[in-house]
A protein has these predicted regions:
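Conserved RNase H-like, two-metal-ion catalytic cores of nucleic-acid enzymes
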Residues: 110-112, 124-125, 317-418, 436-441
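Conserved DEDDh/DEDDy metal-dependent 3′-5′ exonuclease domain
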Residues: 111, 115-137, 142-224, 376, ...
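Acidic, Mg2+-coordinating catalytic module of metal-dependent nucleases/exonucleases
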Residues: 186, 195-256, 267, 276, ...
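Short beta-strand-centered aromatic/proline hotspots
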Residues: 693-719
């Protein structure tokens, strides 16, 4: 938003808004009004620092936009004033005054009326709205279709508001918009002759225009009312939406001791607590909660730790950014420390570094796992463990690093059959699965690792065993408890910084700056090595906590791999690939000699042949993840999940003839957003330990959750603001 001199002398300045402002308002009205207060001079602009990851993504977004521009220029040619055809580029306004904006609007409309094939960055200004449309593309019937580029690989509803905004501006200018509007996403699709194109998502303008008009009306009402009174935007004002995640919200979350500070608190739980007149962490810590379910009691326990009123088993004082901090911890009475495997001298501690914004030039496929880092368990006390990095700076190198890593682990398992691979959180497991599917290699090996419990996620142990006084359970928050004075330092301090650093490395390498490239890469390596070391020390600290409480590590049978492949060539280990898949995979090897176009055709065929197997595998991977992670993990964000808070038996067990016994139960809880829960649909019901008779846990040594398929939804409803399901 910005203000222009009033058209009517002596009146207040006119507010001008953009499509981006409507997107902000749709996501967070509080942020919108805070920014409006800054423009009104009611409050200073806060210094939230530079988000290098956001800046990096914005640069890549510009590159994406100009690639699409180049495609249009190649198709239609540059603007030719003599014919009125080609791609017309509207240069940005050199100033933001009313006359200049009106002139740019007139220039854009003139290019459209002249019949330009494409108008790039068409400027619109109607006195209230100002915006620049990425592309307006002429259709055979003379109408213009709105195209917008988004680096995102998936559609966001807010992006459709921008398309509708420019469609509305065309209507106001008397130019017919095509009924189909298009998002050119960052996701790519292979072309039959080789290369790739960006995925285009088409939408119906008449369907989204009413939503845009409603959001615009809300925006104008909100801003008009705010400017009509003298106060700044107030956090928590009734009727004012707030996302809770942006910098403006986070500032107030901390300032007001908001419930969102509680680790693992979600918006639905916060809303339920507000209904109990509980608004702060302190109030939750001190509240009396009659009838509270186990999830709410866990949150209260966490709030007590963060408020300093909960009982603790220890604390650590440390200095960060020149200030002293204290972190406290408590071991839960019912914990998962016994599930930790017995230490083995062959254990390794694993961490990936990946760049989701790296894009392969030939195929357009996003994402590169460029470093597989491992620290081996120290051979003896006082001797540091060996750090082994597996680097990859291309897609082919990524496959080789993946296979080398699998081979390294398999050979190590031959020597140390009781070993485990420790990591923190789900990224490593997810990345290994993704790599096995992408490269059509090592799938059976990765599956076998998962079945045999080789991978040990210490995050699951932490969240089921201890409480800490921090509002996050990231490994970086835990490190003061066990890393002593060896706390993080260096230029690369978190995953976002490592992504930016890797992009800088690529730039230095490609611009012939080998010394700078080597310096950046060394910083990334140090960061990854510290992550691996931190995972090792966390495992040791958890074992110490268990030992202090007389808890021995897991006593289940050692994980002995069945029929380990004797060959180091792990392509032979893909027992779950069919003959056709294996044959096609051979054609895709770098030394196959196939021309690029033929390789592309073989790749498409290979993907089609293995489609159903991959889809089945993805289903079961997701299923066992849910069984392993439980309801405190990502379920509140997952679709097609009903989180049960209460259950009431409506009919006891009964049998109809020879059918299996059944009963009717009413479940009360929350249906996650976007779920397709319908009467007559069949679902899986999952139980937490202790499990019912006949069920075995899906985790290591038979621990974890499990349940049964075949649960039919009979009726859906709502009760006191909560969802109900009769099954």
């Amino acid at each position: 938003v910005f203000f222009l001199e009033p058209e009517v002398p002596g009146s207040s300045p006119d507010l001008v808004y953009s499509a981006s402002d409507l997107v902000v308002a749709a996501s967070c009205e509080y942020q919108l009004l805070r920014k409006l207060d800054e423009k009104l001079g009611r409050s200073p602009k806060p210094d939230f620092g530079v988000d290098e990851m956001l800046e990096h993504a914005a640069k890549l977004g510009d590159v994406h936009e100009h690639r699409v521009l180049a495609e249009f220029v190649e198709e239609f040619g540059p603007w030719d004033p003599a014919t009125g055809r080609g791609v017309y580029d509207v240069a940005p306004a050199d100033s933001m005054d009313r006359a200049t904006l009106a002139a740019k609007h007139a220039e854009s409309i003139e290019a459209l009326r002249a019949g330009a094939d494409v108008v790039f960055q068409a400027a619109f200004f109607d006195g209230q709205f100002h915006g620049r449309s990425d592309f307006l593309v002429r259709q055979p019937d003379g109408s213009y279709a709105v195209f917008d580029t988004k680096l995102a690989r998936h559609i966001k509803v807010t992006a459709l508001l921008q398309l509708a905004a420019y469609g509305d501006q065309l209507l106001k200018a008397g130019i017919t918009p095509d009924p189909s509007v298009t998002l050119v996403l960052g996701a790519t699709v292979p072309l039959p002759g080789g290369g790739f194109d960006y995925l285009r998502s088409h939408h119906n303008l008449p369907d989204i225009l009413p939503v845009f008009l409603e959001r615009r009306e809300r925006f104008l009402t909100l801003t008009s009312a705010h400017m009509g009174q003298p106060n700044t935007a107030q956090w928590g004002s009734p009727g004012l939406t707030a996302c809770g995640r942006c910098d403006y919200c986070q500032e107030m979350v901390k300032a007001t001791d908001d419930l969102l500070l509680v680790a693992r608190m979600n918006s639905a739980q916060r809303k339920a607590l507000h209904e109990r007149k509980i608004f702060t962490v302190k109030e939750l810590a001190e509240a009396h909660l009659p009838g509270a379910n186990s999830a709410l009691l866990r949150l209260q326990d966490q709030a007590r730790m963060q408020s300093g009123v909960g009982a603790s088993d220890g604390e650590v004082r440390y200095v960060k950014d020149g200030e002293e901090h204290i972190i406290r911890f408590a071991v839960l009475p019912e914990n998962a420390l016994a599930e930790l495997p017995s230490p083995c001298e062959g254990d390794i501690f694993f961490d990936f570094e990946g760049d989701p914004l790296w894009q392969e030039g030939a195929t357009g496929v996003w994402g590169l796992e460029y470093l597989f880092g491992v620290i081996e368990a120290p051979a003896r006390p006082g001797v540091p463990g060996v750090f082994r990095p597996f680097w990859a700076h291309s897609r082919e190198a990524e496959k080789q690093a993946f296979l080398d890593f699998l081979d390294y682990v398999e050979q190590r398992r031959q020597k140390y059959p009781d070993m485990h691979v420790y990591h923190y959180a789900a990224y490593e497991k997810t990345a290994l699965r993704k790599l096995s599917v992408m490269h059509v290699a090592g799938e059976d090996t990765v599956d076998r690792w998962l079945r045999e419990g080789l991978l040990v996620d210490l995050y699951q142990t932490v969240r089921n065993s201890i409480r800490i006084s921090e509002n996050s359970y990231s490994i970086k928050k835990l490190e003061p408890l066990y890393m002593g004075t060896n706390l993080r330092s260096g230029d690369v301090k978190d995953a976002g910084a490592s992504v930016v650093a890797y992009a800088q490395y690529c730039e230095a390498r490609d611009s012939d700056q080998p010394e700078e490239a080597a310096r950046i890469l060394a910083g990334i390596s140090d960061y990854n090595e510290y992550d691996c070391l931190s995972t090792l020390e966390l495992r040791n600290w958890l074992l110490d906590l268990a030992r202090e409480r007389g808890i021995g590590p897991g006593t289940g049978a050692a994980v002995v791999p069945a029929e380990l492949p004797a060959s180091a060539d792990l392509a032979e280990a893909d027992a779950d690939l069919g003959p056709a898949e294996l044959a096609l995979a051979e054609f895709l090897e770098p030394g196959s000699g196939l021309p690029d176009a033929d390789r592309q055709a073989v790749a498409i065929l290979a993907a089609a042949v293995s489609y159903h197997r991959r889809e089945r595998k993805a289903f079961w991977w997701a299923h066992f993840d849910r069984c392993e992670n439980g309801p405190d993990a990502r379920h509140p964000q997952d679709r097609n999940v009903f989180l049960v808070e209460e259950a009431v038996a409506l009919e006891d067990w009964w049998r109809d003839g020879t059918k299996l016994p059944e009963r009717r139960v009413k479940l009360i809880g929350t249906v996650t957003a976007g779920s397709d829960l319908r009467e007559g649909s069949i679902w899986f019901r999952m139980y937490e330990p202790p499990l019912r008779a006949g069920l075995a846990g899906t985790g290591i040594n038979g621990t974890g959750r499990n349940g049964w398929f075949g649960t039919e939804v009979l009726e859906l409803g709502e009760e006191d603001g909560r969802d109900t399901v009769i099954i």
